[in-house]
Amino acid sequence: MLYQSETLQLHWLENGIAELVFDAPGSVNKLDTKTVANLGEALNVLEKQSELKGLLLRSAKTALIVGADITEFLSLFNAPPEKLHQWLVFANTIFNRLEDLPVPTISAINGYALGGGCECILATDFRIASPEARIGLPETKLGIMPGFGGSVRLPRLLGADSALEIIATGKDVTANDALKIGLVDAVVDPEKLVGSALTMLKQAIDGKLDWQAARRPKLEPLKLNPTEAAMCFTIAKGRVMQVAGKHYPAPLTAVKTIEAAAKFGRTEALNLETNSFVPLAGSNEARALVGIFLNDQYVKAQAKKLSKGVAAPKLAAVLGAGIMGGGIAYQSALKSVPVIMKDINENSLDLGMNEAAKLLNKQLERGKVDGLKMASILATIRPTLDYAGIERAQVIVEAVVENPKVKAAVLAEVEALIGEDTVLASNTSTIPIDQLAKSLKRPENFCGMHFFNPVHQMPLVEIIRGAKTSDKTLAAVVAYATQMGKTPIVVNDCPGFFVNRVLFPYLAGFGMLVRDGGDFHQIDKVMEKQFGWPMGPAYLLDVVGIDTAHHAQAVMAAGFPERMNKDYRDAVDVMFDNQRFGQKNGQGFYRYTQDAKGKPRKENDEQVDKLLAEISQPLQEFSDEDIIARTMIPMINEVVRCLEEGIIASAAEGDMALVYGLGFPPFHGGVFRYLDTLGSANYVEMAQRYAHLGALYHVPAGLRAKAEHNESYYPVAAALLDVSTNQPA
């Protein structure tokens, strides 16, 4: 053994060939600060070996390196900029030393080589992969860019076009695609991977493969003539702005950095990469996007903990077909849980089956399933007009019309037909679970399971715990949601639960703004373009359905009269009274026609301004800041109340529910991350200016206390860098 640390080992293989094996504690290898330092120490040893002829780099695990340790990111980013800069120079010196070894080097890639793992293999002369390998640089998805030479080496290895696509999108590539673009030199069966890498290395040692020619382009300027460069980078910047937009600066920064570095060799190009990385790392967007990644891991770990030892059901049932029931049945069947889909109406069953078939056809068109697989999935959905066989289902999801009497009757009816251990769940969006539980003899077996529409696209499922819901019931439903490929978040019961409870104050803020003379077109534009919502409040209401929103608004007003009851007609009332229900009947705040693909196309409708004049002050222009404040303060206050009341268990779960359930702009990170970015004292001061608008604008006591004590919702990460050495502490 030449060198051994907690994360990697270096030893001789044969005839002057050394092997560097990544083998960290735990299930995967990460390129954390400790591993980077260990790599430097291993190279110290290797550089002294006069008999060294070649180096093979591989993993002892099922993946090479899954990336940097993202749990360290916020700490790294909190270091003073000059210290982060110095540490990146320190880390890059190590990768340069790996690249500059006076012998040929090869990486054997199994599983993932992502982020820092990809940058590590780029520093070797050759790369060979097994078929299941996936290689990529996902940094831009986290609000940063490659920092260990990825933006320098990848374009020089592949050419600018392919490299820009990988770096700007953050998508990884398969082994075969990597072979096509020149990212790897060969793809071999897993059992032959190390042997083939060794053979290739020996060929390089014997002069049959020119390893110096493989290395040289990575050290030199990018080979592009001025016309090619202008064309390539102009197109890339245009595409990035179209897809990422102004709220996500990392992809554009990466493209501009690669462009600026194109005319330089490795040293100057790496300096440019580091100079671009440091400001991105200190940005609010990076903190928010890294926070989302960490929160996602946290909520998935919570789900795993809750459902520990509980298997997903072998058979499920959905009561109520149609679009929603069909969507739930499709998702269940797609993820290998057969499902009974029961309805009282043959047409609804047809609609549900058609919805499932339509979604599977899309999968077929994309090559995700073949005809045989599609048929077998559809065969696991059993449409029925009666309850035959329902007693065999372990989890039954009621998804009938959003009416408490109808839901209660259906739940009581099915409970009489099933065993004492069968779990019942209601897919309701606003009706309190404890209210529905009153109709049941076994309320401990009952909870809420709130799916979001469209079911196949929306990652969140709210699991609602009633006062009598047992842990066993929660575990079964969480296990089912997880098996369905969803992110379940458990919330406590109240009207609207969490997501809808916090959505309606936002929509109420919109309604008050329109009442006071705000132009809904301007409001939508500001909330989309400036704040970053996927759609503004008027457009969202049209998509949700004005009738649905009108009903839910009444439920919320009854549940929280002190804040959500109103003594005036608002824009939703006007739309509802004029039977303008949104996309579902082609007219709401906007008019809808079908485009060539049959999708709704939004158009302005002059009639709407006339209708809204009944309930509005004369139109006036509000500032962007006013529009954002007047719509967002009610939502933010309600989100905070939900945490203070224990409706949600943590800031992390609240933020992920907002991002996954409502499309809250990821670059803000969720309400709690947004509050931490603004500063609680700054927020309270801002909200105070709007307090005259009513109870929705009154800041909860807990948030006021945080502001007084200058506290945040997320812990402030301590800097990880040892300032005396610029190395990991």
From Swiss-Prot:
- Which SUPFAM superfamilies is this protein grouped with? 6-phosphogluconate dehydrogenase C-terminal domain-like (SSF48179), ClpP/crotonase (SSF52096), NAD(P)-binding Rossmann-fold domains (SSF51735)
Query: What GO terms describe the biological role, i.e. biological process, of this protein?
Result: fatty acid beta-oxidation
What lineage does the source organism belong to? Bacteria, Pseudomonadati, Pseudomonadota, Gammaproteobacteria, Enterobacterales
What does this protein's UniProt record list under function? Involved in the aerobic and anaerobic degradation of long-chain fatty acids via beta-oxidation cycle. Catalyzes the formation of 3-oxoacyl-CoA from enoyl-CoA via L-3-hydroxyacyl-CoA. It can also use D-3-hydroxyacyl-CoA and cis-3-enoyl-CoA as substrate.
Annotated organism of origin: Yersinia pseudotuberculosis serotype IB (strain PB1/+)
Q: What keywords are annotated for this sequence in UniProt? A: Fatty acid metabolism, Isomerase, Lipid degradation, Lipid metabolism, Lyase, Multifunctional enzyme, NAD, Oxidoreductase
Q: Name one GO molecular function term.
A: delta(3)-delta(2)-enoyl-CoA isomerase activity
Q: Which residues form the active site?
A: 450
Identification of the protein by name:
Fatty acid oxidation complex subunit alpha
Enzyme Commission identifier(s):
4.2.1.17, 5.1.2.3, 5.3.3.8, 1.1.1.35
Pathway annotation: Lipid metabolism; fatty acid beta-oxidation
Catalytic reactions of this protein: a (3S)-3-hydroxyacyl-CoA + NAD(+) = a 3-oxoacyl-CoA + NADH + H(+); a (3S)-3-hydroxyacyl-CoA = a (2E)-enoyl-CoA + H2O; a 4-saturated-(3S)-3-hydroxyacyl-CoA = a (3E)-enoyl-CoA + H2O; (3S)-3-hydroxybutanoyl-CoA = (3R)-3-hydroxybutanoyl-CoA
Q: Kindly state one GO CC term assigned in the UniProt record.
A: fatty acid beta-oxidation multienzyme complex
Sites annotated Important for catalytic activity: 119, 139
NCBIfam families documented for this protein: FadB (TIGR02437), PRK11730.1 (NF008727)
Question: Which family does the similarity line name?
Answer: In the N-terminal section; belongs to the enoyl-CoA hydratase/isomerase family. In the C-terminal section; belongs to the 3-hydroxyacyl-CoA dehydrogenase family.
Q: Which Pfam families match?
A: 3HCDH, 3HCDH_N, ECH_1
What is its quaternary makeup? Heterotetramer of two alpha chains (FadB) and two beta chains (FadA).
